[in-house]
């Protein structure tokens, strides 16, 4: 069926959510859940890339979104800092960063886990992910 690909960063830009505190992230997480349910209720597949969801958010999604599939892209925070693709880890006074001064709630029971050490291309990781998805659905 039709599929929509959304990034949490994209929604932040569209709706001008520019606060990153733990409290604001919790509120935004609930908005993301409601948005995901709205889209999937219309029989649209949704691939939603977000960072650092909470255990309560994941639980809500599993309970309330039909055919919910959680994919965890696992990597070490030191590897992320070294890659620094978004240029957020070297900003002066960069507060409210998950993994730095906000403790992440890492998934405990993801349907799929992909280990990313930044040594494989995104093309290779994508193929690995598709292969794993096909074994589930």
Q: PLM features: residue spans?
A:
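Conserved substrate/cofactor phosphate-moiety recognition/catalytic segment
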Residues: 1-37
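Arginine residue identity/basic-tract feature
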Residues: 12, 25, 54, 58, ...
């Amino acid at each position: 069926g039709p599929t929509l690909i959304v990034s949490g960063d994209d929604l932040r830009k569209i709706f001008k959510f520019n606060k990153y505190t733990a409290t604001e992230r919790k509120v935004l997480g609930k908005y993301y859940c409601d948005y995901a349910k709205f889209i999937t209720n219309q029989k649209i597949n949704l691939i939603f890339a977000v960072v650092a969801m909470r255990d309560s958010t994941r639980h809500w999604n599993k309970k309330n979104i039909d055919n919910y599939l959680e994919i965890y892209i696992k990597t070490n925070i030191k590897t992320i800092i070294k890659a620094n693709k978004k240029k957020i880890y070297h900003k002066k006074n960069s507060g409210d960063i998950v993994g730095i001064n906000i403790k992440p709630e890492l998934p405990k029971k993801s349907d799929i886990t992909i280990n990313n050490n930044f040594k494989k291309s995104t093309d290779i990781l994508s193929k690995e992910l598709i292969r794993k998805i096909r074994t589930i659905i």
